[in-house]
From Swiss-Prot:
GO BP field: NAD biosynthetic process
Binding site for ATP: G47, I48, S49, G50, G51, Q52, D53, S54, T161, K190, T212
Pathway: Cofactor biosynthesis; NAD(+) biosynthesis; NAD(+) from deamido-NAD(+) (ammonia route): step 1/1
Record-listed Mg(2+) binding positions: D53, E166
Designated name of the protein: NH(3)-dependent NAD(+) synthetase
Taxonomy of the source species: Bacteria, Bacillati, Bacillota, Bacilli, Lactobacillales
Enzyme Commission number(s) of this protein: 6.3.1.5
Magnesium among keywords: yes
Organism, as annotated: Levilactobacillus brevis (strain ATCC 367 / BCRC 12310 / CIP 105137 / JCM 1170 / LMG 11437 / NCIMB 947 / NCTC 947)
Described purpose of this protein according to its UniProt entry: Catalyzes the ATP-dependent amidation of deamido-NAD to form NAD. Uses ammonia as a nitrogen source.
A cellular component annotation (GO) from this entry: cytoplasm
Amino acid sequence: MRAKQREIIDALKVKPTIDPATEIRRSVDFLKAYLQRYDFMKTLVLGISGGQDSTLTGLLCEQAVTELRQETGDNDYRFIAVRLPYGEQADEDDAMMAIDFMDADEVQRVNIKPATDAMIQAVETSGKPISDFNKGNVKARQRMIAQYAIAGARSGAVVGTDHAAEAVTGFYTKYGDGATDICPIWRLDKRQGAAMLAQLGAPEHLYKKVPTADLEDDRPALPDEAALGVRYEDIDDYLEGRSVSEAAASRIEDWYAKTAHKRHLPVNVYDTFWQE
């Protein structure tokens, strides 16, 4: 195994194999313990895209609050699934299929288009035009503003969908979908998450569809793998300690180095990671 590969695996806590049922239990218990530790928190708030990661995380959230209601008799424990479309989203049917399957306690819908467009317009009147890529990051951050507004109104925690295959590549928006309170699937790679969804009986389409962040107007539904230049199969193999091609390993390690700032708090004078 490559030295850098071992370092990354240790940092992201990825196991070479998992028992899906055990990891489901671990994630649910983690969510329950967090809510019970902070007795002012009663809700879990999660944005639902209709992809694998939010579907899995939503199922874990719903199971956690259902068990808490049963065990404590406190019916204030709730899971709020949030749809956050930019206007009309092409994956709306998938998102609603996921929400229906997870049987969320509540569903809220916030159209981020007016706020996003207003922000873009306000910035552009005072400076240079905002690129389509930059606008995509604004969309991601507007979605988190909405989720935190809901969580603040409902004594809630915002739940993240970040996992090891995203963490290693930094494939999320800084202070966008990377800005959450709790990440129950953080240690898992992509195929391990799919195995957990299969264990939970989720519709195959939701975890076999092509993953996409779908943030760019100019390149709608751009596959993650096209944006990253490496397959999730190779990322998962790498994180599980298997051999991958030199090209794939170098690509993964390059992403890991370039996106180190996303896995840290804001840089201060004592930090050295950015110099490595």
